[in-house]
Each structure stands twice: as structure tokens, then as C-alpha cells.
């Protein structure tokens, strides 16, 4: 388990773009992670998306999954951004949205390592709320030295 202070050691993102609040399960041997994002009405994006019917933007759900996958990648390599390595989100395959995410939801983020070739990492990711699927995708990240 990782609290927000440890997460901040593994992700360079900060408010309002840090989208992982807690890691509840991380297994390097099984190459998987489970984390969550508590979605609050105070999120800045709800001011414009949409004021009368607030919904978390899909691109931010994808980013949250990518951040969880990034933590897994750093843990697998036993590195941190402070060591001079970053993961850049470079694409996604098989992307699907199934249900909206609204204020008060706890967005569960799961990622499993698929492959790494020439510093291009691929993860199978899912996001859910209350056991209902919200989004799934293969997230592709590039490992880069600073």
C-alpha cells in the first residue's frame, strides 16, 4: 500500500493533475497494481464539464490509469523520477468508455504489465466505480531518461 506522500515520490504530477490518491495493492512479481482516485465536486474540471451535470472527462480517466501504470513501471524497475527516469504517455489501444464518473465516486484503477520493447511499455488497464466498468484500454508509455 502507498499513501499520497509515497505516490508523490513515484509520480512527477502535482495538483490539480495528480490523479492517484492511494495504491491499495501492488505486486511487482505479478506485475499488477490497484489504486484509486476519490472524485470530489471540488475538482477544477467540474466547473466546465459540465456545470449542470458534472462528469469526469474521459481523457482524465485515461490519464489516471496511465499514472497508476507509471507507478507500476517505476516499482518494477526500482526507480523514481528523482533517479532521472520518466514515463511519457504516448498512446492507447482498445480504448472503451462504458459509464460516466461523477462527483462522490471512488474511481478504482487497475493496471497489469503486458510488455516492454525498446523502452516502450504496454499495460492493460481498467477503471471502475462500485464494481461497474468505466473505462478500459491498453496504455502505452515511453521510458525516457532526463
From Swiss-Prot:
Catalytic activity annotation: a (3R)-hydroxyacyl-[ACP] = a (2E)-enoyl-[ACP] + H2O
Disulfide bonds: none
Compartments, record wording: Cytoplasm
Catalytic site: 49
CDD domains in the cross-refs: FabZ
Primary location group: cytoplasm
Cross-referenced Pfam families: FabA (PF07977)
GO cellular component: cytoplasm; membrane
GO-annotated biological processes: fatty acid biosynthetic process; lipid A biosynthetic process
Matching PANTHER family: 3-HYDROXYACYL-[ACYL-CARRIER-PROTEIN] DEHYDRATASE (PTHR30272:SF1)
Described function: Involved in unsaturated fatty acids biosynthesis. Catalyzes the dehydration of short chain beta-hydroxyacyl-ACPs and long chain saturated and unsaturated beta-hydroxyacyl-ACPs.
Family statement: Belongs to the thioester dehydratase family. FabZ subfamily.
Designated name of the protein: 3-hydroxyacyl-[acyl-carrier-protein] dehydratase FabZ
Species of the source: Pseudomonas fluorescens (strain SBW25)
